[in-house]
Every structure is written in structure tokens, then in C-alpha cells.
């Protein structure tokens, strides 16, 4: 199962970090980026996919126009399942939302949004972030790092770009949001 594979990978990672004397300096938690599926709001075992030690579900939304059904499911995750929803890489969904009705409804729910730091200095992403900030949804940052060859960690560069473009205040707000989420 996914949970068994994740546990195996986590043990391998922990062992490698300890072999390089890096294990004590990092605080690692198991988690999953969970792709939305119809009925997720009623899924009984969804809590097993939250970030370890929290009620946070990192939810990847459909790359399509969002519908009433999607809204109802997200609302159920929050209200019925009592989960804290963190929508993964929100900048990727924008272009699919020809109608903003459900987009706006979802972002009025008590949830958090994650933006990936790659390409923050590009015009299109800057424009998206400026527009998204008006929704006043609490933000956190992600690196979208999947490996050390083609999808490298880029949080430092992204943070520097955010600071240069939007100022220190936004970065401080994001840092406080991240601390509050993971405490």
C-alpha cells in the first residue's frame, strides 16, 4: 500500500540522514499530496493521509473547471471530517477556472493555500500572486522538490524573489502562517 511504501522510504531517508550526521538537525514529518477524487469529503480513511502529527491534508485539486461537487467535498473535509485543508500549488489551477464562482467559494472556506516558489520572478506568476493575495487566504510556500537532478530544492531563491517583489512583510506573514500550521 501507499502507506507502507511511504514508511519504507521514510526509514531509508532517516537512515541516510543519520549516516551523514544530518538527522538531528531536521524535523521531518510524513505526509502525502492527496489528489482530489469525487466523494473525498466522505472518505473514511482520509485522515491517514494527513501530515504526521497534524490534521492537515495537502490537497491537490483537479486541473479542470471546479464544480459545485468539488466545493461540497472540500467543505465536508473541513466541516465533517474536521481537517485543516492546505490546497497544493494553487497557481497551477488558475488558468482552468473560466468561471470564478466555485474558485471564489472555495477560497472563502477556512483553508490554507500553498504556492510553489519556482518561477516567482516570472511575470505571469507575479501577476497571479498579486491577484491571489487579494483573496486574503493564508499562504505557505512549497519547493516542488522531487529529486536532486531535475526538480531541485528552490525555497531560498523563491523566498528571495518574494522578498524582492512583495517585501519583507509578506514573507514574515507566510513564516508565521507556517509556524502556526505546523506547531
Show which residues each predicted segment covers.
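Short acidic/histidine-rich active-site segments
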Residues: 137-153
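A C-terminal functional module that forms or caps the active site or interfaces directly
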Residues: 101, 112-114, 120, 124-128
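Short secondary-structure boundary segments
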Residues: 115-118, 143-145
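Extended substrate/RNA-proximal surfaces in nucleic-acid metabolism proteins
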Residues: 2-114
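Active-site-adjacent betaalpha module
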Residues: 90, 100, 118, 152, ...
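Short active-site-adjacent structural elements
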Residues: 121-125, 148-153, 182
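Divalent-metal (often Zn2+) His-rich catalytic cores of metallo-beta-lactamase-fold enzymes
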Residues: 1-7, 132-133, 138
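Mid-to-C-terminal alpha-helical segments outside catalytic/metal-binding sites
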Residues: 155-183
